[in-house]
Design a protein with these regions (language model features):
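A structural signal for short hydrophobic beta-strand segments in well-ordered beta-sheet cores
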Residues: 95-97
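Short coil/turn connectors at secondary-structure junctions
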Residues: 20-23, 47-50, 56, 75-79, ...
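Catalytic-core segments of class I nucleotidyltransferases/pyrophosphorylases
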Residues: 52, 66, 70-73, 102-188
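A short acidic, often aromatic-flanked loop/helix-cap motif at beta-alpha or helix-coil junctions
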Residues: 31-35, 88-89, 112, 169-170
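Conserved N-terminal catalytic core of the sugar/cofactor nucleotidyltransferase
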Residues: 1-55, 59-67, 175
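Short beta-strand segments
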Residues: 53-56, 82-85, 165
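Conserved beta-strand termini and adjacent loop/short-helix elements that scaffold enzyme active sites
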Residues: 27-29, 82, 162-164
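Conserved donor-nucleotide/metal-binding helix-loop-beta segment in metal-dependent transferases, i.e.
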Residues: 62-90
Length: 188
């Protein structure tokens, strides 16, 4: 899924750089309808497959990450969400974890929270994600919210947390300052 007006830019860049033999299919989101809308747009592409959603403004790094991703690709049912501790949880969707290391609550950009575990932009879902997304109601922002989708999986005891392993990190590069910080991290 790409935002309105960006489709040709992505085609131009990715077509030139696609030397690894993969086929890329694009769907343009014509208006802001939220992250779960990507699954509705891609319903025919997804069919009976499981899917991953990776937000383009996120940077992930870590030696153990490859092994974790390979395990998540083998997902048979349910959903996996990657969590990472942050200093300012009110800027992110946050997950509360209980004593059994299960997600007990998901809150979108809480003013106060007992957790510092941000929900990163890396998700794995079984093929029920399309059906679950169809049942979501738009939020006050008139968008389908990823937190609501995750809560649907959680309420059915089908959501598991993944933690970026030791030596790994996640950086949100959604604004210019964060992008600059990620650039400095990579160059150091």
């Amino acid at each position: 899924k790409v935002n309105k007006g960006q489709l040709n830019q992505f085609r131009k860049i990715l077509h030139k750089k696609n030397n690894i033999g993969i086929k890329i299919t694009y769907k343009e989101q014509l208006s802001p309808r939220g992250l779960p809308d990507a699954f509705l747009l891609g319903e025919k592409f997804i069919e009976k497959d499981n899917v991953a959603l990776i937000l383009g403004d996120n940077f992930f790094y870590g030696q153990s990450l490859t092994a974790q991703l390979k395990q998540c690709v083998k997902l048979k049912s349910g959903a996996r969400v990657f969590l990472h501790p942050v200093k300012n949880p009110s800027l992110y969707g946050v997950a509360n974890i209980n004593k059994k290391n299960k997600i007990s609550r998901i809150i979108e950009k809480p003013k106060k929270t007992s957790s510092n575990l941000a929900i990163t932009g890396l998700y794995f879902f079984d093929n029920k994600v399309v059906d679950y997304s169809k049942k979501l109601k738009p939020s006050q922002r008139h968008e389908l919210e990823i937190a609501d989708l995750l809560n649907k999986y959680r309420s059915n005891n089908r959501l598991k947390a993944e933690f970026i392993g030791r030596g790994g990190t996640w950086l949100d590069t959604g604004n210019i300052e964060d992008f600059y910080s990620a650039s400095n991290y990579v160059s150091s």
